[in-house]
Amino acid sequence: MGYIDRYLTDLETVIRDLSRADVEAVVDGLLLAWKENRQVFIIGNGGSAATASHMMNDLCKLTIVPGKRRLRAIALTDNVPLLTAWGNDASFTDLFVEPFRNLMRSGDVLVVI
């Protein structure tokens, strides 16, 4: 079996083994955020920060229904100067804490990748 066949077989296994209940819970949370006009924050560390940006792009662009309110999503990891300022001046352990104190409200949704 070649590389592509192994990759596709592995991908099929991962998709088949996904918890349908977990995926449904994420979708339900995002739908509720949209219905209640809540903010969705997406964060990740390292390569997952790029995934957070990509997810935010998909949520903001691919969910548009003409004439309907849009989903409000932001990848906090896209603001590198803010994160590194807090990391340098306070602690990299609490990198997201202070920005969330400024931005997050009760009922908002946090997606951590």
Set out the residue ranges of the language-model regions.
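Glycine-rich, small/polar surface segments that engage phosphate groups of diverse ligands
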Residues: 33-104
